[in-house]
UniProtKB/Swiss-Prot annotation:
Protein name: Malate dehydrogenase
Similarity comment text for this entry: Belongs to the LDH/MDH superfamily. MDH type 1 family.
Entry's transmembrane regions: none
GO MF, one example: L-malate dehydrogenase (NAD+) activity
Species in which this protein is naturally found: Nitzschia alba
Length: 32
């Protein structure tokens, strides 16, 4: 599954992307 995190540079994007990285379903993570 591909996931895109909008606003990854902001305060909410970083912890959110960390959570998604730990999730086994997520294979590709794109940050914008």
């Amino acid at each position: 599954r591909k996931v895109a995190v909008m606003g990854a540079a902001g305060g909410i994007g970083q912890p959110l992307s960390l959570l998604l990285k730990l999730s086994p379903q997520v294979t590709e993570l794109s940050k914008y």
